[in-house]
C-alpha cells in the first residue's frame, strides 16, 4: 500500500481495498495488531509497530477522526518503547499525522544504549530508526517530497 501510494496509485482500487481492510482491522479501543480484532470474543491488544505502520499507510486516505484513538494509543505507548523497530514505526506513524514527539533524542539514545546489555541491533532495524528520525513528515510524505524535488 505504501509503495502504491508513493508511485501515484492512491486512488487505485487495490489501494482503496487496502484502506477498507485496515480500517476494518482497527481495534475498537484504537491501534492495530497482526490480524483479527478479537479472538473468543476478547478484544486483542494493539501493537506499536503495526499501529505505526497502519497510521503511516492511512494518512491522507482517511480522516483524522477515523484514527484518533489509534494515535492516542501510540502516544501513550511511546514511553515504553525500547527497540529500534517499535520506536521507528511509532515515530513514522505519528509524524505522518503531524504529531511531535517529546524528547525524541533521549528516546533514541535510550534505545541505542540497550545494545550494551542486549548486543548489537541488526542493520535493518537501525536503518529504520534513522529513517524515522529524518522523516519528520512521515515516510509517504517524505518520499513524495523527494520525488517532486521538494526535499528539505
Language-model-derived ranges and their functions:
Residues 108-109:
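Protein-protein interaction modules outside structured cores
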Residues 1-20, 28-69, 77-104, 117-152:
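An alpha-helical repeat/solenoid feature that recognizes helix-turn-helix modules
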Residues 24, 75-76, 112-113:
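Amphipathic alpha-helical segments of tetratricopeptide repeats
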Amino acid at each position: 500500500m505504501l509503495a502504491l501510494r508513493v508511485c501515484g496509485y492512491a486512488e487505485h482500487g487495490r489501494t482503496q481495498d487496502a484502506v477498507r481492510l485496515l480500517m476494518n482491522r482497527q481495534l475498537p479501543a484504537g491501534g492495530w495488531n497482526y490480524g483479527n480484532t478479537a479472538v473468543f470474543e476478547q478484544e486483542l491488544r494493539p501493537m506499536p509497530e503495526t499501529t505505526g505502520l497502519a497510521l503511516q499507510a492511512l494518512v491522507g486516505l482517511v480522516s483524522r477522526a477515523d484514527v484518533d484513538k489509534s494515535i492516542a494509543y501510540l502516544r501513550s505507548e511511546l514511553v515504553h518503547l525500547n527497540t529500534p523497530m517499535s520506536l521507528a514505526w511509532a515515530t513514522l506513524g505519528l509524524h505522518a499525522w503531524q504529531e511531535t514527539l517529546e524528547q525524541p533524542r533521549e528516546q533514541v539514545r535510550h534505545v541505542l544504549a540497550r545494545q550494551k546489555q542486549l548486543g548489537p541491533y541488526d542493520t535493518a532495524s537501525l536503518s529504520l530508526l534513522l529513517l524515522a528520525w529524518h522523516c519528520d513528515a512521515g515516510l509517504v510524505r517524505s518520499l513524495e517530497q523527494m520525488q517532486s524535488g521538494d526535499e528539505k
